[in-house]
Amino acid sequence: QKQLENGGIFIFDSWKNQKITDWDSILEDDEPDLILAASGDYVFKETVAALQVLLHDVAQVKIRLIYVQALCGKGIGTFENTLSKSDFVKIFTKDKPVIFAFHGYAKTLKSILFDYQNPARIQINGYEEKGSTTTPFDMLARNKVSRYDIAARALNSVSKGDEVFESLVKEYRKRQDDALRFARENSVDAPEIENWGYLKFY
């Protein structure tokens, strides 16, 4: 089996505009305020879009983006190369909120992460069996993993009653409602969704 680069984990720190390839370079006194994580191609793209929304609106919030390529019954990674508990703390910190979008059932990921540090702080959203959908964005929204769902949950996790953050959460709900209305009326996603320019990391 081919070894996954960096254990199949991609890390980007927004406040440094930097990819992290050496986990030993992560400093405990330079931690993010929150973490956006994803496993699965479509939900990762949506998480990247959520990061872009947040960077535009609340650039002062330090956000770590994490993509997890491989999961197994033992944890993050493969059976041969599973992420250790100490490396998990380096990457996911001890106590920062984690918003995790998953391409499978949320309870599956919850059981995989159970033995890692402080799993109660990890908000997981994944596949839910909810009726028929009209467009890709509609499907993401029904599963609560759209960019606006992720951005709203991220702000709620650090808002501490901040009025600006709370008004932005309402704005994200409105943007989502507008995008869904367009999708259901036209059977295609709105241009701002369809033509989104995703952040490039390479």
For each feature predicted by the language model, list its residue ranges.
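Thiamine diphosphate
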Residues: Q1-Y202
